[in-house]
């Protein structure tokens, strides 16, 4: 099972478009939308299948929503993929198939399409550049995260990915690098 985690910090129409991109996939998923109480009230989430709304107390800032997901949803053997609310899933996400990886694999690094149509990939486990990796470029086993959380800073996703890489490598676990485009980076804000 893949848990897709989206923190809603923008308008609900971003969630509608994100849902359409998820619904087009052929994967076993549960979608968690983490948001504040006021934004939760504006969502018509009855139309979203396999979706759980998590209301986070306080404000939504940087990566606090993802951290809140990790605080309230325990390890159930799931893979976690963070879909920023301005990103959209790519149909090739179907090719990732995390259930086919060895139980020793704790992280899968994937590609992401940018507005320029360029594909952003990571070219090695030691080349996870903090300033160049986005949430949409990796999946992680929930158990591998443990107490680790995102830092509430710009590029926090890069630091998080780097820390997961270090923990995984140092514990003798595996990281897979898959040349598959999993999402569109900031797709909902592209100029048409």
PLM regions: where:
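Conserved nucleotide-sugar donor-binding catalytic segment
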Residues: 126-192
């Amino acid at each position: 099972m893949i848990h897709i985690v989206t923190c809603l910090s923008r308008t609900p129409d971003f969630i509608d478009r994100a849902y359409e991109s998820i619904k087009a996939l052929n994967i076993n998923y549960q979608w968690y939308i983490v948001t504040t109480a006021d934004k939760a009230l504006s969502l018509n989430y009855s139309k979203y299948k396999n979706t759980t709304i998590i209301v986070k107390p306080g404000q939504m800032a940087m990566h606090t929503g993802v951290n809140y997901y990790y605080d309230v949803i325990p390890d159930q053997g799931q893979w976690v993929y963070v879909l920023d609310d301005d990103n959209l899933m790519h149909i090739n996400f179907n090719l990732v198939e995390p259930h086919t990886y060895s139980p020793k694999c704790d992280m899968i690094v994937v590609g992401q399409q940018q507005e320029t149509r360029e594909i952003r990939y990571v070219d090695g486990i030691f080349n996870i550049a903090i300033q160049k990796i986005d949430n949409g470029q990796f999946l992680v086993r929930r158990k591998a995260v443990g107490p680790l959380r995102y830092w509430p800073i710009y590029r926090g996703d890069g630091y998080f990915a780097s820390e997961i890489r270090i923990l995984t490598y140092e514990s003798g676990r595996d990281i897979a690098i898959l040349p598959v485009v999993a999402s569109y980076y900031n797709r909902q804000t592209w100029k048409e």
